[in-house]
Regions:
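A substrate-engagement module of RecA-like helicase motors
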Residues: 1-98, 102-103, 156, 163
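Signature of the SF2 helicase/ATPase Hel1-core->accessory helical subdomain module
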Residues: 78-97, 102-167
Length: 167
């Protein structure tokens, strides 16, 4: 009524790629399933229409692992031009509000530092689900730990480099 907001506000929930269906992997997996396995066949058929695996009923953990988007998509993928996941990535940059969890935010920060493609569009406001886990996740991601074995190796290297005071 006041004319402050002139268009609908849009939002998208961002998730890691392991939560989405890879159509190429789905086709391969579906071809291996026996038709007599009705529940499994049904879940895989639903996956052909629903990209987000969290919304596919009765999808087994095994099939979820077999049909999810891989860590890196092959450049020669036969589904590249029609890939639902790639389309989702393009479309998810458009909404006004990005919603993600702490791990996705840290992954985006890592991409920005390494000049890799952004996971989140440039934002002025961001909703972070599970934000209370952010400090621990960042600490775990950006902290190096040395085991006693690592320390022994380091001492040996220092000794070999004639730094006897440190060994």
């Amino acid at each position: 009524d006041e004319g402050i907001i002139t268009a609908p506000i849009t939002a998208v929930v961002r998730k890691g790629k392991e939560r989405f269906v890879c159509d190429a992997r789905l086709a391969e997996r579906a071809s291996l399933v026996q038709p007599s396995r009705k529940r499994q066949t049904n879940s895989l058929n639903i996956a052909a229409h629903i990209l987000d695996m969290d919304h596919i009923p009765e999808l087994s953990r095994y099939d979820r692992c077999r049909i999810c988007v891989p860590q890196s998509c092959p450049r020669d993928c036969f589904m590249r031009l029609d890939c639902r996941y790639q389309q989702y990535l393009r479309d998810s940059m458009k909404p006004d509000i990005q919603i993600c969890n702490h791990n996705y935010l840290l992954a985006d920060a890592s991409h920005r530092l390494e000049d890799r493609p952004l996971l989140l569009r440039s934002y002025q406001a961001l909703v972070v689900d599970e934000a209370h886990k952010l400090p621990d996740a960042a600490r775990q991601m950006y902290t190096e730990t040395l085991s006693p074995h690592n320390m022994d190796e380091l001492c040996l290297l220092l000794q070999q480099a004639h730094y006897k005071d440190f060994a």
